[in-house]
């Protein structure tokens, strides 16, 4: 569900967030319209709006864990976790975490990948939100959900800054809610 459809329609913060995201055509390869959130991070007001909207949504939901998907979920997750009094768990690509880890494989358009987390990072029945910068197919979020749920955690919702208008990945989330702040910008200009 898009934030504008959930009580924030017309909220100027959403426009500021959208305007702060740079679109880079043909990156990392031809035909891709890359949504560059590094420019959002350079705009301290838009970045604060992003965190504030997520915090407002989750502060009264008894969330005990914010899980961030590597790498850009790491940019938003810790700030949200601190503000709502939750711990932050990084969900990493293979070989990035020392010590004992558990993993979940998922399919990409061309190939496979895995997410890993430390054994014991999440406890059974802990309430979790998963944060990433963008959702397209939903494969990464689905793998993150499976990884956390395999340890007995309750995934309450997945949250992303950017989501495709026809969020194709929603069906991969097993009925879990998906909360998205803005649609990709600049697609009409380059298509």
Curated annotation (Swiss-Prot):
Q: How does it assemble?
A: Homodimer.
Q: What happens when the gene is disrupted?
A: No visible phenotype under normal growth conditions.
Q: Do the record's keywords include Cytoplasm? A: yes
Q: Which GO terms describe its cellular component?
A: cytoplasm
Instruction: Give GO terms for biological process.
Output: adenine salvage; AMP salvage; purine ribonucleoside salvage
InterPro entries per the UniProt record, alphabetical: Ade_phspho_trans, Adenine_PRTase, PRibTrfase_dom, PRTase-like
- Which cellular compartments is it found in? Cytoplasm
Pathway linked to the protein: Purine metabolism; AMP biosynthesis via salvage pathway; AMP from adenine: step 1/1
Among the GO molecular function terms of this UniProt record, one is:
adenine phosphoribosyltransferase activity
What name does UniProt use for this protein? Adenine phosphoribosyltransferase 5
Q: What is the lineage of its organism?
A: Eukaryota, Viridiplantae, Streptophyta, Embryophyta, Tracheophyta
């Amino acid at each position: 569900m898009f934030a504008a459809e959930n009580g924030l329609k017309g909220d100027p913060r959403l426009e500021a967030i959208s305007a702060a995201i740079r679109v880079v055509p043909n990156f990392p390869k031809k035909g891709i319209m890359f949504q560059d959130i590094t420019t959002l991070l350079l705009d301290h007001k838009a970045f604060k709006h992003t965190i504030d909207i997520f915090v407002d949504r989750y502060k009264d939901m008894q969330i005990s864990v914010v899980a961030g998907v590597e790498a850009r979920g790491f940019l938003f997750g810790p700030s949200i976790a601190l503000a709502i009094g939750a711990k932050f768990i990084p969900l990493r690509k293979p070989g990035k975490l020392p010590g004992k880890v558990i993993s979940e494989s998922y399919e990409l358009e061309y190939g496979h990948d895995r997410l890993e987390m430390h054994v014991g990072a999440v406890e059974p029945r802990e309430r979790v939100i998963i944060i990433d910068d963008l959702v397209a197919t939903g494969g990464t979020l689905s793998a993150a959900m499976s990884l956390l749920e395999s340890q007995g955690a309750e995934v309450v919702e997945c949250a992303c800054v950017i989501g495709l208008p026809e969020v194709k990945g929603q069906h991969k989330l097993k009925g879990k809610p998906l909360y998205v702040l803005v649609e990709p910008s600049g697609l009409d200009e380059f298509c």
